[in-house]
Amino acid sequence: MRNKPILCVDFDGVIHSYTSGWQGATIIPDPPTPGALKWLWKATGWFDVQIYSSRLKDPLGRDAMLEYMIKHSRVEFGDGHPMTVSRDFPITFAHEKPAAFLMINDRAICFDGDWSELDPCDILAVTKESPDAPISYPVTEIPE
């Protein structure tokens, strides 16, 4: 049997809506982003779905994330579904960034191989839109 390709999915801002910002590795207060759980369940048919998050640096972060996923999956799918049972949970939590076929992340830029098209100032402008980005960037002069 051929192994499925790894699909690495970020947690905060992608699965967890993250509207309250960072509260700690074990505090996950916001609902899932609309459609996330159904999409992830469907993706398990084609991919080895692995969730990667900075929350996993805390030993209790994985448990909090699994609890969150199961709790919200019960609402989405009802009891008895594989997404609602800890021992059958079809998605893994990667303690380090996996060698993924593809990644889904709300804070990433798709690199096309041309560094000349990737302007650091443009990146700063985009990240300034983020609610937990620093207030100001002391960029006064761009090095050539």
Q: Where would I find each of the regions flagged by the language model?
A:
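Catalytic phosphate/metal-binding cores of nucleic-acid and nucleotide-processing enzymes, i.e., regions
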Residues: M1-E144
